[in-house]
Amino acid sequence: MRLLIGTLFVVVCTAGFFMSSVLADNTPAANAVQINIFNYKFDPETATVPAGTTVTWTNKDEIPHTVASSDKGFKGSSGLDTGDSYSYTFDKPGTYKYYCTLHPFMTATIVVTAKGG
């Protein structure tokens, strides 16, 4: 009986350790924003973030897309196949419009505010 309780204790502790690791890995950073590309849209179409935020675009569509700055305000991506991601850190406040070069009707905006404001 003592062996059974000891074994159960070890199993529960081990499972708890692994679950906390998995949950910690899935928690987004405070200075990170996720934008999904799906159904020929960027979601959300407008994101407001403080300077220093990393924005990650993930293509969840069945066809390739890109992320391209409308005014060369930031470095854009190359083609993103299904499941591919592209990240960029916005350090300067401003309004950044972007689009998909393969589907120019797909447009969106990142508004970067000063840190803390």
Predicted regions and their residues:
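Extracytoplasmic copper-binding redox domains, predominantly the cupredoxin/blue-copper superfamily
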Residues: 2-11, 16-117
